[in-house]
Amino acid sequence: LKTGSDDILSVIGGRGLAVVRIPIPKKSFVLGSRPVLKLTPPETNDLSDPRVELFLAIAPDVMVGVGPLDQGEVIVDISDKNVRLTNESVCTQSSQITGRSKELIASLSPFVGRKVGKFPLPEAWDEPWFDRLRT
């Protein structure tokens, strides 16, 4: 961001912060060589669009991202299913991954390096808070 435009910093500053927690201790996020996950609708990838989301896992059980427009922080829990979708997406765009357990890495290894690029918003995303973030 140091070399980014003032517009990018302004957009991020106006979005607030979303903190996503995994409530089940058995589950965890992986980190990939391309760790930032950008979720976009098909017609745009502009971060000033409230439907575009950007997330980064910062701990095995915590992910942070841009929050709702003109709001402060939101802290939400994520479902097991969406932890898996998030991990698969990070793996797909990464050439290397690391995680908390051998079993987790083995289960995600088929997804590693399959595609680099933007990812559409998952159709199966079932978090009620996610819809609130986009409005």
PLM regions with names:
Residues L1-T135:
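Alpha-helical structural context detector biased toward long hydrophobic helices
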